[in-house]
Structures are given as C-alpha cells and as structure tokens.
Amino acid sequence: MEILGFTVMGGGGSPAWIEVPEKSKSAFWELKRRKVHRYVIFKIDDRREEIVVEKTGAPGESYDDFTASLPADDCRYAVYDLDFVSDDNCRKSKIFFISWSPSVSRIRAKTIYAVSRNQFRHELDGVHFEIQATDPDDMDLEVLRGRANRT
C-alpha cells in the first residue's frame, strides 16, 4: 500500500507496522506504574521505522509545560497522567492518550501518524481516555477534566 509516496508494506503484502521499541514502552510504564513522569511525548523517527520518546515531563510539571512541549506544526503522540479531584471530592488519576495532529502539519505526517495510531495505542495498556487533537482547544485542560469526571 502506498500512502502519499510512502510505501507501507510488510512481507506477503501485509501492512508493515512501525516498531515500538522497549524504551518507548518502558517510558509509558514508568508513567503508569511508578509515576516517574507527568507526561511522555513520542514521535515517529525520521526513517519512519520506530515510535521513539522525544520528551518526558517530571511529576511536578504542569499541563501548560506539557502543551508547550508539543510542536505547533508537526504531529506527535503523547500520554498525560492527569491528577484531579472528582465531583464527589475524591483524588483520582487518569491517563490520557493524545494524538496531536495540528491542522498546519504536513499531510504526509498526518497520514503516517493516523495509520499507526491504533497500533501504537494498543501497545499502551492502561490508558483511560483517547483524544485526537488538531487544535489546542481540542485538548484544553478543562476538556480532559470533563472527560475524567464522567467516569
């Protein structure tokens, strides 16, 4: 299969998946289990072969720090660990998978990220919510809080 001049084929004509290295999976597990990171930002490497960790945020970093770390003109995947107080006044934590595909990013990048999103998301067991964002308003902190409070 060819997508915008990029051939996506494996042996026997099956789709070739972009690899998720152990280091990328470990960064997610460190966020989920050990609370070492507040967020992890992933990108598809320049060879379009692997989904790699681009940046991690320390537990004390804010949501604004996270959103400022996303490029304004290129796609990324991210996981964010949202701590919040629920409507019934309980402290909770929910993990969000965010597919960031700004409207100004290249069509080729949008396509490659869209094609590999489900495969990557499947590797991250324990994500509570998924958000697909093309604009900062799509992933405003209040949007996340609203989704988290509905559970």
Swiss-Prot record:
Example of a GO biological process term: actin filament depolymerization
Pfam families: Cofilin_ADF (PF00241)
Cellular component, GO, one term: actin cytoskeleton
Domain of life, source organism: Eukaryota
InterPro entries membership: ADF-H (IPR002108), ADF-H/Gelsolin-like_dom_sf (IPR029006), ADF/Cofilin (IPR017904)
Listed SUPFAM superfamilies: Actin depolymerizing proteins
GO MF annotation: an example: actin filament binding
Keywords from the UniProt entry: Actin-binding
Record domain ADF-H: where: 15-149
Family recorded in the similarity comment: Belongs to the actin-binding proteins ADF family.
Task of the protein: Actin-depolymerizing protein. Severs actin filaments (F-actin) and binds to actin monomers.
Record protein name field: Actin-depolymerizing factor 10
Gene for this chain: ADF10
